[in-house]
Amino acid sequence: MTKDIVLGLGNNIDYEIEWDSAIFENLVHEFGIEYSEIHPVGEVQTQRDLIISILSYMKEGKGGECFVRSSQIIEDFSKAFRKKITLGGTSVRAAIAMSKIGYSSALHLVTMNDDVRRLLPPDCEYICSAPEENSYPHLIIQFTQNHSIRVQDKIIRPKQANRIIYDNDLDNILMRLDPRMSQLLLNAKVFLISGFNAMQDQSLLEDRLEKLLISMKNLPKDALVFYEDACFYNKNFSRIVRDKLLGHIQIFSLNEDEFEGYIGRKINLLDPLEVLRSLEALYKLIPVPKIVLHTQYWALAYGRDANSLKKALKGGITMGGTRYRIGDDFTRQNYFEMEKSAPQKEGAQFSDRINAMKQGEICCLPCVEVNDKNVTTIGLGDAFVGGFLPALVH
């Protein structure tokens, strides 16, 4: 394999349901859910738990990822709605996004089935570690400010658009690594690492990290390693992954929810001083050459010679905005039209102010203005990665 962009490590099938507030309200009534019960749910044990969890996220206007006890809960819930089957996983969505604008990649996969073969870009090369074919669907819930739900005499209306992911995916829990990974990396200029967040066994996680580092010895000396963070079911596992990989990562990338998770509080993303102080605190925890942070208002690079990532940031913002506006079925022309779109006013003001505060160490660009009401909220970070990485190579 000769691809210079290699993307890993996991993949999956998504059930993207077509949201219908009337159907969901009927389920709320059917399960006798009261407003006082709406609170965050840890592990989803039943379909009733699932409905309460969705209501809790909508009430807060937040996104997240949750483990369900059984995939049957996902199957049963999704039967009530129309749904679209798509590919999930940061690496696969990034591969699909960059293929739309003419860049191909090589993938390490952990799940294989007819849907994966059907939906992968034809120009992608791949290896897969799965010993047999399986499908462990992830349930994708997307909501906007226009979606309101009545629970008893209360109305829940999200503060902002977001998405929730529910899954029980054995292939990603086990995260088997294909021994051919070493050969896949021989000619890589950029290597994306993502996907350890679903793992649940510490000894297994440590084994996979050791195997990954052995494979990474085959990377060319000038290859760039890009790590995309995620919401870990076990927060301690996030620390284990960081401790093992930080010395091998050039860029550590994360979104606003993950950023706030590390800092431990809500952050005003339009306050440059607060964001800068939080970035400085994050850097003490994650001392890598560059941190990339992508949010709903702006995206930035933090670290020495941050301006070297300006083109990549622009590519990521453009790709994320294109997916947000159009969804899966955008075209190359849609991408280049988005590239010329006006920036968000708030994001532009923030970018100007924070760039002036730390010249040379911060490069911040505003997101584009998108006023469409029916938007896509799943896979925006993955699309950002798909727009960001090609600029590092080409």
Placement of each model-derived feature along the sequence:
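Ribokinase/PfkB-type carbohydrate-kinase core domain
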Residues: 1-375, 393
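Catalytic tyrosine of NAD(P)H-dependent dehydrogenase/reductases that use a Tyr as the general acid/base
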Residues: 378
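Conserved single-residue anchors adjacent to enzymatic active/cofactor-binding motifs
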Residues: 381
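Active-site-proximal C-terminal subdomain of hydrolase catalytic domains
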Residues: 388
